A protein has these predicted regions:
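Short, well-ordered beta-to-alpha junction loops that form the rim of enzyme active sites
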Residues: 59-60, 109-113, 156-158, 240-242
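Residues that line or immediately flank small-molecule/substrate-binding pockets and catalytic motifs
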Residues: 157, 179, 232
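Hydrophobic "anchor" residues on beta-strands that sit immediately upstream
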Residues: 107, 152-153
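Extended active-site neighborhood of metal-dependent phosphoesterases/phosphodiesterases
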Residues: 1-101, 125-134, 138-152, 160-215, ...
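Short acidic, glycine-rich surface-loop motifs adjacent to enzyme active sites
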Residues: 97-119
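A short hydrophobic beta-strand element
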Residues: 108-110, 176, 235-239
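A short C-terminal boundary segment appended to hydrolase-like catalytic domains
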Residues: 202-274
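Gram-negative outer-membrane beta-barrel proteins
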Residues: 66, 116-120, 245
Length: 274
């Protein structure tokens, strides 16, 4: 794994709370009254390996908008003070997946969302975050070179839940925004006087000209969490609103990806006796 730039000012708090590998277990002042120790991930971008899933975590820097993982040379805006080291890492991680013939689910996780919903009326809540097309171009370029594409992309940042399906070539890829895990206030996707936002809704403004993007579902009312299930043949992502409590665990939204075909399918639940 490529080492992070630990001198970057934007990383100091994150490193102190999440990147403490090699240190004894300890709580940081940021934990407040929580009985939780600092995490031990190796850096601000990383590969997390598990039997049926490989997660590539990217660091999209500390701007409110946009998310940035490179200098974005030759594009507007560009960021000459940001290293391209994450592109080196991402290319190497994807090529390793190809070389090792990893057959499980490949997830890319990045804080800033590549997509956020666009209302056809043009009326949106003023605090709504923007999509990050240039960041997605960087990810796409690395995937194209390696010949490896993610089965899903997970993000946060926007304080609500949104799910999109991107169709490109024969691949159907869920893009999930889960930014309503507890940070208040929840951000509404429509402003005062806007018509009801109904899904599914095509999002032509999010297309790069080679794909199609559909806004599938959302929750801008509740806090919630994701449950991600992977097995040798499928990846299932569930959204659960916190208002359901501990006794109701049927998801309000879900999507399943066939790992071999990259198509959205009906989930084949494992037998209770298996």
């Amino acid at each position: 794994m490529v080492a992070p730039n630990t001198n970057a000012d934007t990383l100091s708090a994150f490193l102190a709370n999440f990147c403490t590998a090699g240190q004894p277990p300890h709580r940081t002042p940021d934990a407040g009254e929580l009985s939780r120790t600092a995490q031990i991930q190796p850096g601000v971008y990383f590969t997390l390996e598990a039997p049926f899933v490989r997660i590539l975590g990217l660091y999209s820097n500390a701007l409110e908008d946009p998310g940035v993982i490179s200098q974005q040379n030759g594009k507007r805006p560009s960021y000459p003070n940001i290293s391209n080291v994450q592109l080196t890492f991402l290319n190497a991680a994807l090529k390793r997946i190809k070389k090792e013939k990893f057959a499980g689910a490949v997830l890319i996780a990045v804080h800033h969302p590549p997509y956020v919903a666009a209302h056809p009326s043009g009326k949106t809540a003023p605090q709504k975050h923007n999509a990050n097309a240039l960041m997605l171009e960087d990810i796409d370029s690395a995937c194209e070179v390696a010949g490896v594409w993610p089965h899903a992309i997970l993000s946060g940042h926007a304080h609500n839940y949104q799910r999109f399906t991107r169709t490109q070539d024969s691949r159907q890829t869920p893009f999930v925004v889960l930014g309503n895990g507890g940070h208040a206030p929840i951000q509404r996707l429509t402003g005062k006087g806007s018509p009801t936002l109904r899904t599914p809704m095509p999002q032509p403004s999010l297309s790069n000209g080679k794909d199609s993007v559909v806004f599938e579902n959302y929750d801008d009312q509740d806090f919630g969490y994701l449950r991600v299930i992977a097995d040798p043949s499928q990846l299932r992502i569930e959204y659960h609103p916190a208002t359901d409590g501990a006794s109701a665990k049927t998801p309000d939204d879900f999507v399943t990806v066939d790992l071999e075909t990259y198509s959205l399918v009906h989930y084949q639940a494992a037998s209770a006796t298996a």
